[in-house]
Amino acid sequence: MHSQMSGLPPSPPVGTKEDPAKAVDGLLSLTEFQVVGAAKAMPADKYSFAPAQGIFAASQTTQFDTVRTFVAQVTHVAQANYFFFGWSGIQPDRDVKAIGSITTKDEAVAALEASFVYAHKAIATITPENAFVAIKPIDGFSTRTTIAAFAAAHGYDHYGQMVEYLRMNGIVPPASAK
């Protein structure tokens, strides 16, 4: 577990009142460390990989026609970061919709990394005064802090799927290799 947590900064002393932006940013940084690491670990020629019936036993019948490719997992997280942190009012530095059309590893990783830069900028606008003030809800969450925490959780959901894709291709995820 320690190797998977190595993306976090050191914890403050017990009893210290922590700045909400710093606390949430640490959570997002850990998600970023894992997701970007997985995205970089998958070889470029495997970015079009998606699980299909042929890799499972005949008795394990499932519909795979809507399963995302690896590149779609990466670009989905990138687009979601822009969506979740749009409350900040910070204008994205790219066409967010176009991210969904990316098909190459280099472009997907660049978009993913840029989306985390955007997310960190948004989190930096969270203050003790506005952290838990209700704003326009996103997926049922209505404060800057809860939306930011949900964004990190969402990234972890897709990280778990990306790990499965890596393992199906014989690749040990970077966090597990340490």
Description of each model-found segment:
Residues 2-26, 74-138, 169-178:
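Short, helix-capping/interhelical loops that line the mouth of catalytic, cofactor-
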Residues 14-49:
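N-terminal targeting signals for Sec/Tat export/insertion, comprising classic cleavable signal peptides
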Residues 25, 33-36, 49-97, 136-178:
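Short, contiguous alpha-helical
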Residues 39, 122-123, 162:
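Hydrophobic residues within well-ordered, non-membrane alpha-helices that form the packing/core
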Residues 44, 125, 141:
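Catalytic His-Asp segment of secreted/periplasmic serine-dependent ester chemistry enzymes
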